[in-house]
Amino acid sequence: MAPPRANSGDGNDGAVGGQSKLSPSGLLIREIPGGYGVPFLSPLRDRLDYYYFQGADEFFRSRVARHGGATVLRVNMPPGPFLAGDPRVVALLDARSFRVLLDDSMVDKADTLDGTFMPSLALFGGHRPLAFLDAADPRHAKIKRVVMSLAAARMHHVAPAFRAAFAAMFDEVDAGLVAGGPVEFNKLNMRYMLDFTCAALFGGAPPSKAMGDAAVTKAVKWLIFQLHPLASKVVKPWPLEDLLLHTFRLPPFLVRREYGEITAYFAAAAAAILDDAEKNHPGIPRDELLHNLVFVAVFNAYGGFKIFLPHIVKWLARAGPELHAKLASEVRAAAPAGGGEITISAVEKEMPLVKSVVWEALRMNPPVEFQYGRARRDMVVESHDAAYEVRKGELLFGYQPLATRDEKVFDRAGEFVPDRFVSGAGSAARPLLEHVVWSNGPETGTPSEGNKQCPGKDMVVAVGRLMVAGLFRRYDTFAADVEELPLEPVVTFTSLTRAADGDGAARRGV
C-alpha cells in the first residue's frame, strides 16, 4: 500500500470542485492530520517516545494537541523496526471514532490482535488462535462456538473456584503482614489466578499440583515470548531493554519445552471438552482446538486477570476508607457473615455499588488498551466534530484509555468515580455502559459466533465483582502503596483491617 498523503491538519478540508464534502451525518470531511515522517528513523523515534520519553498517554495527547485537538491521526505505532514491517496506522482517540473498531462489517481483524506485528505461529503449535481470526473466517464461528459453550457450562464453577483462590491468597497476605510485611499483591495474584482459571474452566488438578510450583513461571515465559515487543520498563537500563525486547523476535524454540508441558497439562485437563467437541462440533481438528484452549485459558483469561485485578485493588486503595465503608455495608447486607457464601447472583441483584466499581475500573484501565482492525473498504470515520476518509486496507488503531475517558461522553472522565454506573432503574447507566468497551464490544453487547467480542466477558466481570465483594466481606478497610508501570500497577499491601469476628474483635496487620 502506498503511503497516504500526510496532512498538517491546518484547514486542509476535503473538497471536490471547490465544494466542501460532508459525511452522512453532516460533518465536514477533512484529510487525516499527522504523518509518518522519514522511513525507519521516524518510527524508531516514535517508539522511544512511546515507551520511554513520553509514555503512551502523553504520546497521543501531545499529538492531539499538535493537530488542533483532532482525535483521528496518522501515527507510527511500536514496535517499528525491525519487528514490524509497516508501523503506519490511523489512530482513533475518541469514543465516537473508536466504535468503528467494534463493527465487524467495517474492519477485518485477521492477525491484528497485537497490532503491527504478528507472533510466530510456532508459539501456538503451528495454529492460528481464535483471537487472530477475523469474524468472517469460517474457523472463527466453529472455534468460538466451543469456547462460548465452555464458558457458559462452567459459569457455576467460577464462584467456588474463586473463593478457594481468594481465601488462600489473602491468608498469605494476612500472614505476611503479621510477620512484618508489606506484601506485594501482584506476585500472589499471578500465582493463585492461574490455578483459579484452570479450576473454573476445566476442573481437575490445578497446574500447581500437576506441573509443580514452576507452572506460573512457564506460563508467564510463554506470554513474554508473544508480547515482548509491547512490553517496557521491565529491564534496566532502557537502551538495553529496547535492544532486547523491541528490535528482534525472541526465538520460539527457547520456550518450546515450557509450552510443550503446558499443552500436555491442558490435553489432560480439557480432555472431556476435546472429546465432546469431536462428537458435537465436527470440523475442528482436536490438536487445533487444544492449542486454542491453551490460548484462551492462559493468554485471554489468566493474562487478563493478571492485569485487571491489580487495577481494581489500585483504585480501591486510592479511594480510601469512605468508599470501603460503603462497600462493606452493601456486601454484608447482601451476604452477612455466617449467612452463606457470596454468589454471582447475589452480586448481580443486591450489590449495585460493587458492580459500578468494577465497571469503572474496566473503563479507566481496560485489560487490553488497544484495538486494531484493517479497513474492509474505503470509508468515512467520524469523530465528535469532524469526519475523515480512510482507504481500504489501512490499519486502524484505537487507544482505549483515551476513548473510554472521553470528556464528551463521561463527566469527570479522567477520575475514578465509584458510583458512576449506579442507577435505581438502570436506565441512566445503560447509555454510559455502551462506551465501556474493554471486551472488544460494548458492555451492553453480547458475544456471538459472528462477532469479535470476548467470549468470556461475563466471567471476567463476575471475577472482578467477586474480588471486590470478597475483600469487603473479609476486611473493613485496607491501605496499599501503588507503583504505576506500563502493563499493570504493582500494588503492595501495607495494612488490612479484618472485619469484626463474632466476639467483636478486629485484627490488623501492619
Curated annotation (Swiss-Prot):
Keyword Heme attributed: yes
Annotated binding of heme b, by residue: K109, H140, K144, K452, C454
Catalytic reaction list: (13S)-hydroperoxy-(9Z,11E,15Z)-octadecatrienoate = (9Z,13S,15Z)-12,13-epoxyoctadeca-9,11,15-trienoate + H2O
E.C. code: 4.2.1.92
Pathway: Lipid metabolism; oxylipin biosynthesis
GO molecular function, one term: allene oxide synthase activity
Protein family per UniProt: Belongs to the cytochrome P450 family.
Name by which UniProt lists this protein: Allene oxide synthase 4
